């Protein structure tokens, strides 16, 4: 069962409670959970009490309720109860040092304008830049523009004037993945991942630990991620598109 996304940073308590009441509870029928473990983007420390309160009202018979951020979800999914380094690589990117129970260190990702190395948004930014500055074959540029119906003016407008520019840039990933046989394009993907290791993972000073990753970019570009990890002196651990299966194992 699933609902629309819940982000306690962007949504207020009333909105979240409505989502749970209208989208989750009807699907659960007579199921009475013994424990609820909520993990979500935007679930910072100052939002934990709010989320636990909302869930407590929705499930008054539940004995155990926890709310945590998506970074801990990724760490528990790929590392389980072992010490390790965990990364999120989707539209955005993040990473942490994990001690087998909690996040003990986190290099701030800074978003796709200032950081987010290894993310789909940054990959898209590199791709568009390389296309229009002659760093990739001209036929690749022509094919992409024809396939998407975009032009330079439209792209500039989407990036600088429309909302969710990060998602637009990340949407180039599908085309990039289909053309990895173009050598400079694959090298761009590998270099984007290498920058993630250099700028973020290296800060933990733990090349002895395996690096696991969650997210669509990590999952679909696993081969390139493995090349980048090896080039930077790391060993790649588990890679998952979604943390759900790993979290089920962790809490079982």
Walk through the language-model features, giving the residues of each.
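ATP-binding/phosphotransfer module of carbohydrate and carboxylate kinases, centering on a glycine-rich
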Residues: 1-35, 56-58, 78-85, 126-252
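Glycine- and acidic-rich phosphate- and metal-coordinating loops
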Residues: 35-38, 68
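Cofactor-binding loop segments of dinucleotide-utilizing enzymes, especially the Rossmann-like FAD-
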Residues: 41, 70, 216
